[in-house]
């Protein structure tokens, strides 16, 4: 299945949007792309939001029809992740699993915290730098449980099935064997990345341990079931999230016409990023 992107507006601007297309028609990045690319073989679709080594905080929006990828804002200003030495921007290709949702009404029995009201986050650790809106086929290896301001924010660790290392990586212990230091660096980055913005260090459940593949698959199934409840309108949050879709004809929010309302592609030159975003921050206590 081939997916393409439709960019509207200039990157690093409030108008920037990236829609996912299938057969040239916009679809929902949240609801229309199947979670499984090949369920029998454990292969998942991942929507890339943020390429590795970049700073713009891009995310699938929950508030607009067909859920394009936009840059997050705070008090009307675009948000960027700061550079925490020795890292530059995001440490991995960062994205989400479609057709998943971390339910803010349900407390996880082990983390003791509710979901963060977003699709399930994915960290793709392969060698290629991805692009915003890319739909990658990945296999999952493990998961970390970030506790972000009182919410469970799972971070699934996965690798592109076409990566040269993919055949050797089948569970979380293989990551340390073939990519020594990656899990430690990932843990450190998520602990400290908000400190330059004046926020406290993030905490992890399980003392920062990355859980194995079997545990991860259970988390994914739970989040897929939560999404099914959401898209069917049975969740209390169904009215707060845009559920418009173009493929799920048995849902009340199905719309065959939604794609025609999406603006035509309008790729403009990138807006400049303020030079202050280049600054390196040295965090006391980080490795």
UniProtKB/Swiss-Prot annotation:
Main location: cytoplasm
Keywords annotated in UniProt: Cytoplasm, Hydrolase, Magnesium, Metal-binding
Keyword flag Magnesium: yes
Reactions it catalyzes: diphosphate + H2O = 2 phosphate + H(+)
Coiled coil: none
Biological processes per GO annotation: phosphate-containing compound metabolic process
Subcellular compartments: Cytoplasm
Enzyme Commission (EC) number: 3.6.1.1
GO molecular function: inorganic diphosphate phosphatase activity; magnesium ion binding
Xref: InterPro entries: Pyrophosphatase (IPR008162), Pyrophosphatase_sf (IPR036649)
GO cellular component: cytoplasm
Enzyme class: hydrolase
Family in the record: Belongs to the PPase family.
Name listed for the protein in its UniProt record: Inorganic pyrophosphatase
Source organism of the structure: Kluyveromyces lactis (strain ATCC 8585 / CBS 2359 / DSM 70799 / NBRC 1267 / NRRL Y-1140 / WM37)
